[in-house]
Amino acid sequence: MALLALSFRAYGLPLFERTGSIELAIPSSAIGASIGHSTSFSSFSFEPAFWVEFFGNASHPNELTFKLLAHIFERGGQPAIRPGGITMDSMIFDPSAGDPVRTISEEGGVYRTTVGPAYYESWSNFPDNIKFVSTLNFGNDSLDIARDMAVASVKYQQNRIAYFELGNEANNYPSERWDNSTEKYVQQWQNWTETIDEAVANDYSHGRWWASSATTDNTSLHVRPVDLIPAGIDSTGDVSVFSIHFYAFATCDPERAAKATIPNILNHTDLVTYADEEIYPSAKAALDAGKKWVIGEFNSIACSGAPNVSDTFAQALWVVDVQLINAVRNASAVYLHQGATLVFQSSQQVNSAGDDGSPGYSTYDLFYPRDGSKRGKARALPSYVSQLFLVEALSSSDTRVRALDTPEGLSQDHFSAYAFYVDSRLSKLALINMMPYYANSTSDYTASFDVSQHCGPHGKAWVKRMTAPYVDTGDTQMVTWAGQSFETGSVVGDIEIEEVARDGVVEVRGSEAVLVLFNKEDVYGL
């Protein structure tokens, strides 16, 4: 185990009890690190009711969306796409329909989304290696609806489908559906998936199902993976992946909205505690059963985010840390959710649609796909750069990840570090300083790390920096990854790849994250 010397300055808070040089332990081998992660680890979930807004259609794709995705693709990322969320449970297939169409209820919520062949045909706008989850409506309690969607997805896009998913967050369905009985839920789920398997050509769906897709809410119906596995949901061998959703904060009601602040979402200790207490029991149950597990949907703040929190640079730091928290816990993939305000989620929620009825895009989105009265012009948001950080960190297939212990003297609440291994050798290092740095802060909370022991044979290493003027910066033009910004989808600025100096010191300011790369061939853009 090698040691990374570190010094820090100006941590003028009681949480930092010592000054001077300290050391961060970095194991030189991958023993004890995570499973090997694929280049599809960082994936996406998009609310299907807003599919056309985000992606356009087969003949007219959304230019901004695909420009932003192209930067991920060209760095080697292969994110899977889950057209999922609450509106998948009111989605129907009509063979005579065109592009997806939303039906709005009198209350202003999305009552139904009708899709036709054009919906599936629009998947062809993605590169051939991008796979999809075929999401099926369980909420309307109609086997015909779910079966027809499965058959249509295979008819039009068989080669793109990686998995099938029946229902979204069933723990929040009306309680009378299964009388809060896990066993009744399992029975219906198995009956439906068996029938759908028989209906799909060549038994294509058997053994490709996601199971659970529950939230961590405290509900009377218990259908998290940790509940379903002992109830025998995989007794037929149909389950490939167990899914659970990760939302540690919410603006669905005033009480929870008050807690959805920048300091709270950037508390690393609390994020780890949530992962260990609410997520990992289900993850462990899946792994013990010999199955993969995924975060099938997640974002920082449920019910469409919190303005001035999730639409700031703080969200970028949150995304990087949470994805890596789950990577070290052996999630096979994480699906970052994107969408717009849904009235049905809560009558007390902070967010709303536009006054003219146009979508009120979620403030936790990576980008606003179209101009709108609620959110203004179409543009990338500050959190977009988090995806470039992550795809470059995990650019090599079979990368293993390890969380490093916080050294004595640094705050566990505000610092996290991760080592990346390829072929059992250290290849990269992520250093995330989540101490909130504002315009009126009395310190910039910079920490200095000595990486000289891990530099290559010629003593070299390179740094890419994810930064903004302040943690609450909301102007995407001021947010950069390796010196470049991406507000319009086009690259602005020259790439800045820092070569570590002879002394081996890398500095990380408060509210900043850096990726240290020890192999020249791994440095995109060099």
Question: Which sequence ranges carry the predicted segments?
Answer:
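Aromatic/acidic polysaccharide-binding cleft in carbohydrate-active enzymes
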Residues: 302-416
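Carbohydrate-binding surface patches
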Residues: 408-456, 468, 511-514
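Acidic, Ser/Thr/Pro-rich beta/coil linker or hinge segments at domain junctions
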Residues: 444-512
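Fungal secretory targeting signals
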Residues: 1-19, 81, 526
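Conserved beta-strand positions
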Residues: 46, 83, 134, 166, ...
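Noncatalytic carbohydrate-binding groove/subsite architecture in carbohydrate-active enzymes
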Residues: 148-150, 182-322, 329
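Conserved, mostly hydrophobic/aromatic
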Residues: 44, 81, 164, 169, ...
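N-terminal catalytic cores of secreted or lumenal carbohydrate-active enzymes
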Residues: 16-211, 219-228
